[in-house]
Amino acid sequence: MSVTSVNPATNATNEYYLTRQSQMESNVRSYPRKLPLAIAKAQGCWVTDVEGTQYLDCLAGAGTLALGHNHPAVIQSIQDTLASGLPLHTLDLTTPLKDAFTEALLAYLPGGKEEYCLQFCGPSGADATEAAIKLAKTYTGRSSVISFSGGYHGMTHGSLAMTGNLSAKNAVNGLMPGVQFMPYPHEYRCPLGLGGEAGVDALTYYFENFIEDVESGVTKPAAVILEAIQGEGGVVTAPVKWLQKIREVTEKHNIVLILDEVQAGFARSGKMFAFEHAGIEPDVVVMSKAVGGGLPLAVLGIKRKFDAWQPAGHTGTFRGNQLAMGTGLVVLETIKEQNLAQNAQERGEFPCIGNVRGRGLMIGVEIVDERKPADRIGSHPADSQLAAAIQTACFNNNLLLEKGGRNGTVIRLLCPLIITQEECVEVIARFKKAVAEALVAVRGA
């Protein structure tokens, strides 16, 4: 049976395929429970289900599809690679295509190939995160890691240990030891109850003092790992001066600074990498999702000083995905040629509703219950019931998006970078309508 011969069954419905999926796949499946559709085809910012209904896609493979679905240049790259005679899988053997992709990607890192080298990892962001921590421990000879509340770094054993959300962690015993969590700045829900500049200043001082205090009780870590914009944690943007202090302190104490750019990277924030908003240079950059142009690929950018690997010190069978390197090269070229970083910045600043935060096309809207008293910094309690109802109402209005953040109360928009002004207007119109419908359903108002 070929791919082209797999057509929807006669008169098949979404329910038909979802029922079959529930019968054949593990209970672990997640997205179909919130977005109950079976996708037949997709193009750009739109997907069409097996019943012929079209949806605006503001999920985009959790940010993987920077150029949207089935971009002509991406499809052409796949066809060209298949026709070229290149092997699809090369371990870490080199090819002309890999050489071109490596050079193009290095050019986007601060200082380029003079400052950084690349390491190709397994196919997922979690694989690259695991490799980054292993490298930091190899380089420093130390064993502990500092991560941050609200952070997300993957679902594997080690990466889950460094992730803030407890729902997945509570079911697993014996995660990687030696992870120390620290508070991450959050203007709307400041962990110190201060908010504003006072909260940022206090957290900046706290981090520096924690590292330098000989009575802190925590030995010097091998690495500090963080996201410049927390995605799954609710689209929380790190303040510039806090990030700059993290860089200053880690550099002073020879602690490896790892920036997880798996979701925020590749122009989504309005710059190629989200850490660029603070003007810093990480020691290790974790890249996946958009780096492969929609196909599985994960890469580390490593400052040459920290490239402590011995030959074959870290390997992985699927680190030589030629199709992904080809499509990744197309994404890099298209981002530059069409100035998609600027497009992300402009579309992200389009007037919107609610409590919006983030950068570029990485946007979060936190849903609260304004009827209940605000806390000491003026933030109302989260309303998870209403947030879930809004997501459902968005789906019913043919708009696909995800929730995240604490208690699942942040509506997240990860639109493809190619989204047009007209499509942004349509997203907002559908979202407004969904919010109004959800309010009636939940509160009768």
From Swiss-Prot:
State the Gene3D superfamilies in the record: Aspartate Aminotransferase, domain 1, Type I PLP-dependent aspartate aminotransferase-like (Major domain)
One BP term from GO: biosynthetic process
Record flagged with keyword Kinase: no
What InterPro entries does the annotation carry?
Aminotrans_3, Aminotrans_3_PPA_site, Dat, PyrdxlP-dep_Trfase, PyrdxlP-dep_Trfase_major, PyrdxlP-dep_Trfase_small
EC number(s) in its UniProt entry? 2.6.1.76
Lineage top rank: taxon: Bacteria
Q: Name one GO molecular function term.
A: diaminobutyrate-2-oxoglutarate transaminase activity
UniProt cross-references to CDD domains, sorted A to Z: OAT_like (cd00610)
Record-listed N6-(pyridoxal phosphate)lysine modification sites: 289
User: What name goes with this protein?
Assistant: Diaminobutyrate--2-oxoglutarate aminotransferase
**Gene source species:** Acinetobacter baumannii
The lineage is: Bacteria, Pseudomonadati, Pseudomonadota, Gammaproteobacteria, Moraxellales
